[in-house]
Amino acid sequence: AAAPKSSTQNIAMNEVARESIRKDKNFHNGNYHDHNVIPKDGLKTARMLGHITYLSEEHMDNRFGRRFQDSESKLNKGIDFEIENYLQYKGDKFADSFDANSYILMTKAMDNYDAGKSQDINENLKKIEAKLLIIGFYSDWLYPPERGKEIQLAAMQNNINSSYVVLDGEHGHDSFLFHTDKYSKIIRKFISS
């Protein structure tokens, strides 16, 4: 799932994530390695927010609902719901394995990406000689299907051989990680055509 540029909402979510890192007492204006610390709290919060954007409401309802977390597997005593425990776990795991400055740079790069920034998207697409396959998922609210359709319509205006497919997938933006048989057949067919 993709779009010709990041939406205002995407940029807003990424800025909240970056700000959580910058506000971490261990961030030290990005020089945390000089202080032998890691801004884990900020990175954890950033990932928790980011992870929410990858999931659909349907998936979260089906997987977690409003179920309470059992006391044996609670990560801390302030947790009531399974979704809270899940996000805490995902945030902790990510904060132990990812660099905070890299996260800031990566999200800034995504925010600044714009296929038509320097000129009309049609001008940029004219440079493409390959055929395009755009796949989206109905449940993806981070990059909704209509954003991928923008790419395909611009490709068609430039006589670029393109295909656009929207698949069911209850997992939101993360749908590409599940039921890979659904889209692997589409990709194989596209490559062989």
Model features per residue range: what roles?
Residues 1-93:
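Alpha/beta-hydrolase-fold enzymes
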Residues 3, 138-140:
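Residue-level signal for short, function-critical loop segments
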Residues 89-90, 105-124:
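Active-site nucleophile elbow and catalytic-triad environment of alpha/beta-hydrolase enzymes
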Residues 101-108, 185:
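Feature representing long, continuous alpha-helical segments
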Residues 125-129, 156-158:
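Short, conserved loop/helix-junction motifs that constitute active-site signature segments
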Residues 128, 134-136:
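Short beta-strand/loop motif that positions the catalytic acidic residue
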Residues 141-150:
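Conserved alpha/beta-hydrolase "acid-adjacent" motif
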Residues 149-193:
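Catalytic active-site module of serine/aspartate enzymes centered on a nucleophile-bearing elbow/loop
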